[in-house]
Amino acid sequence: MASTSEEGRMYDKCVIGYWVPERKRQKFNWTDFENICESEGFRLKMIDMNLSFETQGPLHVFLHKLTDMQSHAESGDKNAEDIVSRLQEYIAKHPDLIIIDPLDNIRNLSNRYKSYEFIQEGIRFKDIFTPNFVEIKSRNVHEIASTLKKRGIKYPFVCKPLLAYGSSNAHKMMIIFNERDLKDCQLPCVAQDFINHNAILYKLFVVGDRFHVVERPSFKNFYEEDCNSLSTIFFNSHDISKSCSRSKWSILSEEDIPLTVKPNYQIFETIVKNIREIFGLILVGIDVVIENHTGKYAIIDVNVFPGYDGYPNFFEHLIDSIKKLLVERENFRQISKSCTLKKCQSDDLDSGFESDEKKKYSTK
């Protein structure tokens, strides 16, 4: 294990390269991160994605929010394709570079249907689940109704864009209450069971092996009679769950107020541990609701490098995570070096033994 003085020397030469959209940097007050990096002995360097990465190196850590760039590349945008391709080449040439977070791992969250499949396959706890879901591929109302029925999706359900990022529409969603409004589905999309959760959304903001839970407003409970009387609710998921949101759809009836379930933070810990294992991410946000009556925990979405609103000491925890990754990398190097040395010594001994044996037999 590296000593404190060794760690200090390690960080003095460490360059954290980053590319984060300006809007996100302003929201985070990026100057605070620059100051923390400087005080911890790191050098923070903004990377120009249009220039050669080699000429901007050497880099020890690359921190990024390239979800939109990746999405555009996958959609055929030539400039985005070139940037992502050059970055992947640079990463391949520098296997010791720490990426927060790996591009392939992030890609697993680009498609909501596939990400829900990953969660469904990876979560094996009776009190934790992802709501029933299905991809809608047809605009025909009767075909949509048939697909929902086969999958056991009941009204109301949430209709979400298939792509989780890369478009301004990624957070434009709707709650559909009946078959007559299936025409409102915007393809490509995923239908997900709506879970009654007493208008409380829990955002689990994860930074490495730490996390913080923020309670946000959400949708009130909907019942069978609502399916007859209500039309589609169109909403932006960012707006409905803002801390300052005052939507009429978040106001509980008096009889529903006692249904609120007090959260169990040990279950949140289990969710965080499992989602990190499933997706292999350092910076991730997990949206969780607690189902009324059953008290089960529903994972309704997972997001890459979220906003972290309400997360105290985010930059300090990020730097701590980077330090831990650097120490783990250094320990791995030392172990690899030790194993290589032992193998060389073993090979030398074997070679000597073989040589002596050959001499012995050659004299007979």
Located regions from the model:
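Active-site nucleotide/adenylate-binding loops and adjacent lid/helix of ATP-dependent enzymes
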Residues: 1-20, 56, 66-70, 80, ...
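Short beta-strand/turn micro-motifs composed of small residues
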Residues: 19-22, 48
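Short N-terminal binding/cap micro-motifs at the start of the first secondary-structure element
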Residues: 24-30
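Conserved acidic residues
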Residues: 58-62
